[in-house]
Amino acid sequence: MRLITKMFLAACCSLVVATPALGQNTDAESVDKQSTQEETKTMPKPEQFLGKCVGKWQGTVKTWFEPGKLVDESKVSGEIVSLLNGNFFRHTYEGSMKGKPRHGEETLAMNGITKKFQICWFDDFHMSGAILISEGDSIERGFSVSGKYDWAPGKPQGGWRTDYELKDSDHLTITAYNIMPNGEEAKAVETVYERVKEYPINSPSQSSPSNQP
């Protein structure tokens, strides 16, 4: 796998708290508590997370070749589908990078024994005929997985961390970080998705023409 500027080229080419009177609860506290409870209810359990991501998505993807230096921002479209009775999921996407077409695919799963998330990823821009295998744990709104890749013969491997986060049911962010051999991290790729709303079967735009004049 190539790093930008060697390592980066292969990877990316990557209180203020008001105290109420004793024994009293402010309206704001009640609202915050209710909001937190509602948010907790809507968050999918780790084993349900991938299923909540199924659907068609569109948005933007940003790429950094070096820390803090944004080199590309472009449109991206993707789809996540369920495979083999929901035991596996496939994420396919297409977009562009500096005007050139870019395509990629991920196979995702949650290991039923270890309860860890696992991803197998390949991409026609970031890879050099290699497959990146990553594994990790759930986080508050999704999961975070890490893997290693080769960027030059005889050199220490680089690391790659990917975070999947559902902001809500219609907004998914996938952020990848390049990890140098010394442990330093830098944001490499950020995909911000919005769910594509598809017409319901019985919507007026797809219903049969009226028989009445």
Where in this protein do the model-derived segments appear?
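Sec/Tat signal peptide C-region and signal peptidase I cleavage site
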Residues: T19-G23
